[in-house]
Amino acid sequence: ISDGLFRKEVPAYDKEVIRELVCNSLVHRPYTVSGDIFINIYPKKIEVVNPGLLPLGVTPENILHKTVKRNEHFANLCYALRLMEREGSGYDKMYEIQLSNGKQVPSVTEGNDSVTATVERRIISKESIKVIQQALQVEELKQKQIICLGLIAQNETITASALIKKLNLRDRDALSPWLDKLVDDGLVEAVGQNRSKEYRVSADILKNSEYKGTTSLKRIENYRIRELIIEDLKIYKSA
């Protein structure tokens, strides 16, 4: 992706993400269940299909947080060989990479006797790539905060409840380590009050990242809306 001095190479599929998915399928599959692992390559996505079901207590919704050990020694070996992230952090890493590349996070679906993990090829937000790069130039962010910023950047505005749902968190307190530093550091703005409060990337970050995405009245400050109305009335006096 090139825009003036800004340039970032975005692969169709990040090798770390694919490697993590394949290693996960090998390490976390139930070997008491027969069947092969399938890697299905389509023009717009890659699927890794695993025989068996997710470990007890793990669901497609809580897979970002919930860890249940299965084939522990195999997992430790793959981690020691640097083939995969330590147990419990693989999906965090994949979320970070996908969002930093302006793509959707991996999706997981559970069938009757198999689990399918899917990564999409399509970039859904080029602008969010620049937003995250600009934010990392001005602040040191943890993985959780990069993930949260990526989700916010891919949306014009988003509520805390929507973030909680996307991240499968318990409540607003659980969201704090993901979100609060972004607001405190001025990377994200909070608009509204209480339950109607929404979050968006700050105007300074958008400006410095040379944001060229679509903008609606939600993103324009009140004083700018007033100026636009006055200017419009000057042009169209008869109105």
Regions found by a protein language model. Name each.
Residues 1-239:
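C-terminal regulatory or interaction extensions
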